[in-house]
Amino acid sequence: MFVRKLLGVAAFAGLSASAAAQSPVYYGTTWRPVQASAAEQPGMMSPSITIIRQNAPSVTEIRQVAATEPSPLPADIGSEQKPAPPSVLPDVSSTASTPPVAPTPMVSPGTPAASIPTLEGGTCAPTCSTCIPPCGPPGRVWVSAEWLFWAATGQHLPPIATTSPVGTDRSLAGVLPSPNTNVLYGGDRANNDFRNGLRINGGVWLDDNHLFGIEGNFFFLGGSKNAFATSSNGSQIISRPFFNALTGLPDAELVSYPGVLAGSLTAESRSSVIGGGVNAVHNLCCNPCSRIDLLYGYRYFNVSDEIDIRENLTALSGQGLVPAGTQYQIVDKFKTQNNFNGGVIGLNAEERFGMFFVGARASVALGANNEVIDINGVTRVMPPNGPAMAYVGGLLAQPSNIGHYNNTVFAVMPELGLRAGVQVTQWARVFAGYNFLYLSNVARAGDQIDLRVNPTQLPPRTLVTGPNLPAFTPHTTDFTINGFSLGVELRF
């Protein structure tokens, strides 16, 4: 009987070990499998799983179990497996367990971002900690077109045309400052009006997850033109003011004066703006409803200005060697071009709320602005009985400042863009935006005009004395653009 009990205990121990090979190990309230060595499992070809239990039952407890619940010895102890008695193995179902972890969803490229679930449990993740491809809106290629309604900083114009009441002494006619002189054109800014324009954007993602890409853009504003024209048959006073460098006093050139001259004066200021660039796009963080991208690349920007002043005069009476009927054509031209080339770095962010979205873009470009300044002038004299003659120089453009000038300076160009829109379809959206752009060290045509004139340089220039004025005195200023835009974007 004693031998039978011992065999029963051995059989029970073997069965328990065999069942435990498929059960976790119990530590308090946690079970875990532990590899047993081959030495601990005689007759086994490879290590098996054994059971280790904290607070395991004692030999006495095992004997009590064997005494109360004897088990006949099977023919092959090692081949039969029976479940362990409930008194030995605890109820696994009663132990605490870790909640199952939801697997990361697999998303095929091109799946609409709004339909992608996130690990946070919603359609839109609250933070940028999880990036489930593809990030952002669908489509690997995008292109957009925007109508621009922007205004640029106008160029400053000095007083170009003045008038005085009839009867004003010839030496004071059109002279500034004078209580009887009014400015007809100039003395303020020109080309600061809102103008229409167009901007084209496009890009492509280089990977299926929309994390790396290339984008490019180009824009232009329609040319701004500010024109002025006046004329008189000699019944009114029209003048062009300047500062006499010989006398050190304000002075004026007559365009029309009763009994002396009849003439016309036209002045035109023009301005144009174009720009563009190419950027690499590197995603910093994203979730199905928002993304933040790093931008770095190349930026180009051009601002061009021109001022053209023309006079057509006819002498009404002879003055010295000038017979009556002599005609004059006087031209002054000032032109500037600014070509900025630089490297740009910035951020682009977008957040989506269902079918609506908002975005912001900020960047700064550092580089070189090449300033090109051209000053030209000519005077043509056509006597009534004689050959026409042409002279270099007009009034404000004289041999002392006429020329082609080139200079390169360091410049900074920050840019800010905001937009909000609606996702019309999965592949199309419309939006409205606001844009601001700044460029430092810009040469404007109006700033290159020097009102100091040495009258001895005026044609026919028989004897030149005194200072070489007007002079080339380059000036630079700040340039800004701001305005609104409406656009449509397509993705493929």
Predicted region positions:
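Cleavable N-terminal export/targeting peptides
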Residues: 1-131
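Intrinsically disordered, low-complexity segments enriched in small/polar residues
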Residues: 6, 12, 26, 41, ...
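Small/flexible residues
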Residues: 6-7, 34, 55, 65, ...
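Outer-membrane beta-barrel transmembrane strands
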Residues: 24, 85, 89-90, 95-158, ...
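Solvent-exposed loop segments that connect transmembrane elements
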Residues: 161-183, 236-258, 310-333, 374-404, ...
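A short acidic (Asp/Glu
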Residues: 372-374, 443
